[in-house]
């Protein structure tokens, strides 16, 4: 009898502990943060930046005509970086797939998203849509493996010009025609410019998304090179206010290039969702500090990058 009672009590203990764990996880109201390693264009750099604590990577995609050919930034670039590291785009995507496919020897559970900084400024107007189609084909074949156990990371397509909305329309059309419209659930969008003569207003950016047929999965970036002064973050604060409004169209906002502890804290304090940095370990250190470890945490795969955080 005593043995039976002990067994019952033991089972209840396990159940209660499990319930407490579930409640604890649900009660974690800290803002998830995407730690985006900046300008990762050579495959040898991928594990290096992941080892520094990045849960996301950004690569620059350059075109020959409308064909995405290399991951390459070129000069000038952020201070302290090698501007000319590169890889063939298809090879880079295949390598990303290895790092984000469960069961692969290179798989990293914490690598959850990558941003493709699409250098479409070199394209003529009639090349923009074909370029979007070609990027979709490359991702489908070399990253998603034609829908057969491809990489699981989320993808953000970052375009430097709100006038290039036809890129997105072409991209989406290819996935639909190929029978892989479901993969659009893994894709987000970021219209980041143009920067000259001045950045577009949020209203103009919103209109561009409407023209692209995009309603949701929207990221917005703001910032400058790492050797520029921080400034007053006026546009960033305006974007965050819009994101958090009742009729906001932005889901996530990230700031770049943030390399110092002071600028990292300043960006977190105003409410960003992501930090793009040349030194991912800096953010990791800040997230451990008192005053930050109770408000922010590193995003995981279970965090939806297309969902606006509500606290």
Swiss-Prot record:
Catalytic activities: an N-(acyl)-sphingosylphosphocholine = an N-(acyl)-sphingosyl-1,3-cyclic phosphate + choline; an N-(acyl)-sphingosylphosphoethanolamine = an N-(acyl)-sphingosyl-1,3-cyclic phosphate + ethanolamine; a 1-acyl-sn-glycero-3-phosphocholine = a 1-acyl-sn-glycero-2,3-cyclic phosphate + choline; a 1-acyl-sn-glycero-3-phosphoethanolamine = a 1-acyl-sn-glycero-2,3-cyclic phosphate + ethanolamine
Residue positions of the active site: 38, 73 (nucleophile)
Disulfide feature: 77-83
Keywords of the record: Cytolysis, Dermonecrotic toxin, Disulfide bond, Hemolysis, Lipid degradation, Lipid metabolism, Lyase, Magnesium, Metal-binding, Secreted, Signal, Toxin, Zymogen
Binding site for Mg(2+): 58, 60, 117
Location (main, coarse): secreted
Top-level EC class as recorded in UniProt: lyase
Protein name according to UniProt: Dermonecrotic toxin LlSicTox-alphaIII1i
Organism lineage: Eukaryota, Metazoa, Ecdysozoa, Arthropoda, Chelicerata
């Amino acid at each position: 009898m005593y043995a039976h009672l002990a067994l019952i009590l033991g089972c209840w203990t396990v159940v209660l502990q499990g319930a407490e764990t579930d409640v604890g996880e649900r009660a974690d109201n800290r803002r998830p943060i995407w730690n985006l390693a900046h300008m990762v264009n050579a495959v040898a750099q991928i594990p290096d930046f992941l080892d520094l604590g990045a849960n996301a990577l950004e690569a620059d995609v350059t075109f020959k005509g409308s064909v995405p050919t290399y991951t390459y930034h070129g000069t000038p670039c952020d201070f302290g970086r090698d501007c000319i590291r590169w890889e063939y785009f298809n090879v880079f995507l295949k390598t990303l797939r290895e790092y984000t496919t469960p069961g692969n020897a290179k798989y990293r559970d914490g690598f959850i998203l990558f941003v493709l900084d699409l250098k479409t400024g070199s394209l003529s107007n009639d090349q923009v849509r074909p370029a979007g189609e070609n990027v979709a084909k490359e991702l489908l074949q070399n990253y998603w493996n034609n829908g057969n156990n491809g990489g699981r990371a989320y993808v953000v397509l970052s375009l430097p010009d709100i006038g290039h909305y036809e890129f997105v329309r072409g991209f989406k059309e290819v996935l639909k025609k190929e029978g892989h419209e479901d993969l659009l659930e893994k894709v987000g969008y970021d219209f980041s410019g143009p920067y000259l003569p001045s950045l577009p207003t949020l209203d103009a950016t919103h209109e561009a998304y409407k023209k692209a047929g995009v309603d949701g999965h929207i990221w917005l970036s703001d910032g400058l090179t790492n050797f520029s002064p921080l400034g007053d973050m006026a546009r960033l604060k305006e974007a965050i206010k819009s994101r958090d409004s009742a009729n906001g169209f932005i889901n996530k906002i990230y700031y770049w290039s943030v390399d110092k502890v002071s600028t990292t804290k300043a960006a977190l304090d105003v409410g960003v969702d992501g930090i793009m940095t040349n030194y991912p370990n800096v953010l990791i250190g800040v997230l451990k500090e008192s005053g930050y470890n109770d408000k922010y945490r590193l995003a995981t795969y279970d965090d939806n990058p297309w969902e606006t955080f509500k606290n």
